[in-house]
């Protein structure tokens, strides 16, 4: 049986939970066609997160790899378009590291684009009534670190698709952040199930508007 690898993160930035792992861990063992979903929790740590991700990719040789992270303040599921080759941490990671303007891969390309059918994934979520959009930036913290590193890792594996999805706070988190948007666990889970199915079955992306003016 083939594998789909899905990762989430441990809590960071003073939070007691991370919605990415709270939802991703519920996907463990799910099957789509002939693929089984395997989940892994990554530390919110520069370097170490990629070491663990790369080990999981080598172990499982997955068909699809999707990393999921928290984007508190975003209102919808955001499928990332691009990871850039820079760490520029506004806050320290969970080991106290705070790299500023440091290349993730020295001498690597400036950016890697997602190899997922990102617009088709967004369209499929919207068809089910789930707010979703394409995002043009994964930030410059550990989420972008993982996205860029993932895409660099699979760059020569033409049979592997990979990318990153950001999700909003869960309601229990938003209660501590006045005015912050949130999304229910079951809605996020449904969105990720849709994303995995489309990523596995769709060989190429659709031609649809997904850009931004700023």
From Swiss-Prot:
Keywords (A to Z) from UniProt: Cytoplasm, Hydrolase, Protease, Thiol protease
One GO location term (cellular component): cytosol
Top EC group: hydrolase
Presence of the UniProt keyword Isomerase in the record: no
EC number, as in UniProt: 3.4.19.3
GO MF annotation, one: pyroglutamyl-peptidase activity
Cell location: Cytoplasm
Signal peptide bounds: none
Catalytic reaction equation(s): Release of an N-terminal pyroglutamyl group from a polypeptide, the second amino acid generally not being Pro
Functional description taken from the UniProt entry: Removes 5-oxoproline from various penultimate amino acid residues except L-proline.
PANTHER family, per database record: PROTEASE FAMILY C15 PYROGLUTAMYL-PEPTIDASE I-RELATED, PYROGLUTAMYL-PEPTIDASE I
Family: Belongs to the peptidase C15 family.
Protein name: Pyrrolidone-carboxylate peptidase
Organism expressing this protein natively: Enterobacter sp. (strain 638)
Record gene name: pcp
């Amino acid at each position: 049986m083939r594998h789909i690898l899905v990762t989430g993160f441990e809590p960071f930035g003073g939070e007691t939970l991370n919605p990415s792992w709270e939802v991703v861990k519920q996907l463990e063992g799910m099957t789509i066609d002939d693929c089984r979903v395997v989940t892994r929790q990554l530390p919110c740590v520069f370097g170490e997160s990629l070491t663990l991700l790369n080990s999981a990719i080598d172990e499982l040789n997955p068909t699809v790899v999707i990393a999921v992270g928290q984007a508190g303040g975003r209102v919808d599921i955001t499928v990332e378009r691009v990871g850039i080759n820079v760490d520029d941490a506004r806050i320290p990671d969970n080991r106290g590291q705070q790299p500023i303007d440091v290349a993730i891969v020295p001498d690597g390309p400036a950016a890697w684009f997602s190899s997922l059918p990102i617009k088709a994934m967004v369209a499929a979520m919207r068809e089910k009534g789930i707010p979703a959009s394409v995002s043009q930036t994964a930030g410059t913290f550990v989420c972008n670190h993982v996205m860029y590193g993932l895409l660099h890792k699979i760059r020569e594996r033409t049979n592997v698709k990979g990318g990153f999805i950001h999700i909003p706070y869960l309601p229990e988190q938003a209660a501590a952040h006045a005015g912050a948007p949130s999304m229910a666990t079951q809605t996020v889970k449904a969105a990720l199930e849709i994303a995995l199915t489309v990523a596995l079955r769709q060989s190429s992306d659709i031609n649809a508007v997904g850009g931004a003016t700023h």
